[in-house]
Amino acid sequence: MLKAVKSNFQVGIDNQFKLSEAATIADKSELDKKTLKKELGDLRQELAELQHQLFAEDKRSLLIVFQAMDAAGKDSTIRSVFNRVNPAGCQVSSFKQPSSLELDHDFMWRSNIRAPERGKIGIFNRSYYEEGLVVRVHPDYLKYQRLNDLPETLDEKNLQGFWQNRFESFNDYEKHLARNGTLVLKFWLNVSKEEQKNRFLSRLNEPEKNWKFSSGDIKERALWNDYMHAYEELINHTSKEHAPWYAIPADNKLYMRVQVARTIVENLRAMNPQFPKVEKKESEKFDEMRNLLESE
């Protein structure tokens, strides 16, 4: 079964993660812009090369999950880190409000059909983990799933066992993927409440960013503490050796992107994908084919 290598900001599997102790910004000594840009460029190039080998090998795959509060930088991080990767070997899926078709299936269905094929990198911009985050903060959403085992009162006390079952479903699914050749890496982009405020103000004050803002963002921000509670419990229950969480400081976007890229590259290095070897019967024809081409 595939397992991740240990990296910076990796959450342990001992159920001791404290969200209040997780950094949102690095030390100033680590924030030199020139140094970070150079490292990010090098990591992008290596990521492109490793992805090419993974695609050619066509035996294993990588699933990368991004979760965060609004304005943490999920979209821009995906765009930045993967900007040299061959689009043919990479697929990005965004998960928003479920459609009527998706609600007619179990809650993992829409994610499972978007899982990466062998040889590919799958990127989830939000994911099945919304079922233990936004749905937990807004338990009334469960009514639309037409489940037959819900308590009459959808409060935290009555739903505690329900959420434990969902955590088990997440873990079982990721273990199944790992056993079948898909490594799962999960990034929680940890933006501070103050930095989120600044980014929201930027979206309001700069016309070219207005489209990114919704009044609903402010309503969700008012539930910040509820979300932090949901994140802490979810991360503690679902960070595993085969599918770890990484709590990445997100107040400085460039630093965040470097940490994400570095973690992905370190894991692909450990996977060590190989170009397939040509069968001897075929390689024996190479000289003949070369001579035919050169004689044209």
Segments (PLM) and residue ranges:
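Loop/turn-to-beta-strand initiation segments
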Residues: 60-61, 119-121, 181-185
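Conserved nucleotide-sensing/catalytic segment adjacent to the nucleotide-binding pocket
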Residues: 30-39, 88-159
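A glycine- and Lys/Arg-enriched "phosphate-lid" helix/loop adjacent to the NTP-binding pocket
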Residues: 136-167, 176-229, 276-283
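Glycine-rich phosphate-binding P-loop
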Residues: 66-82
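Conserved nucleotide-binding/hydrolysis micro-motifs of P-loop NTPases
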Residues: 98-101, 127-131, 139, 190-197, ...
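NTP-dependent small-molecule kinase module
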Residues: 223, 227-232, 236-296
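Charged, amphipathic alpha-helical linker segments immediately N-terminal to NTP-binding catalytic cores
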Residues: 1-44
